From Swiss-Prot:
Its EC number is 2.7.7.87. It comes from Xylella fastidiosa (strain 9a5c). Belongs to the SUA5 family. TsaC subfamily. GO terms for molecular function: ATP binding; double-stranded RNA binding; L-threonylcarbamoyladenylate synthase; tRNA binding. This is Threonylcarbamoyl-AMP synthase. Its main location: cytoplasm. GO terms for biological process: regulation of translational fidelity; tRNA threonylcarbamoyladenosine modification. Coiled coil: none annotated.
């Protein structure tokens, strides 16, 4: 069984390139330092997920991602819609700058971002002072874990640890919308 981590221990694990599990708004997530390409590839290998699909970033403050985003290309109305939906269970694909790492964007020209209202996720991102990869804690194609005890045992040996707590109680993972068009990409 993977070790339970405090927030400061989780930050240390992230700094060292580790992958952690933590509860999100609806399901358990896997996370790592988005700046470390090796850590992201480790996470993708654990999930058996294709790298071209792109990944979601969760953060407490949008300014932690300012170098990776090109928000000037959004209309004021679209930007307002995005900003007023946060913090909350809304993931938006925002225009990525040329500095956004390809290992996060995948084969896309946008960056999927959520400013979470989940207390533990927000506290973790604040302690970390950076965004965190947020992808469901499951092998690709399998159902995501809704409780810690539902985490796939095959994932556990690969984790640096688990930040324990309840999920936010949502019935479904967060919606994903395209910030440029407003179209719903995932309900």
């Amino acid at each position: 069984m993977a070790t339970t981590l405090t927030l400061s221990e989780a930050v240390t694990a992230l700094q060292q390139g580790g992958v952690i599990a933590y509860p999100t708004e609806a399901v358990w997530g896997l996370g790592c330092d988005p700046r470390q390409e090796t850590a992201v590839h480790t996470l993708l290998n654990i999930k058996q997920r294709a790298s071209g699909k792109g990944l979601i970033l969760v953060t407490a403050e949008l300014n932690t991602l300012q170098d990776w985003l090109d928000l000037d290309t959004l209309s004021p109305e679209r930007l307002h819609e995005v900003q007023t939906s946060w913090p909350g269970p809304h993931t938006w694909v925002l225009p990525a700058s040329t500095r956004a790492p390809h290992w996060i964007t995948g084969h896309h020209n946008g960056l999927a971002v959520r400013i979470s209202a989940h207390p533990l996720v927000s506290a973790l991102c604040r302690a970390w002072n950076m965004a965190l990869i947020s992808t469901s804690a499951n092998v690709a194609g399998q159902p995501p874990a809704r409780r810690r005890e539902d985490l796939d045992p095959s994932l556990l040996p690969h984790l640096a640890g688990i930040v324990d707590g309840p999920t936010g109680g949502l019935a479904q993972p967060t919606s994903i919308r395209d910030a440029r068009s407003g179209h719903i990409l995932r309900l």
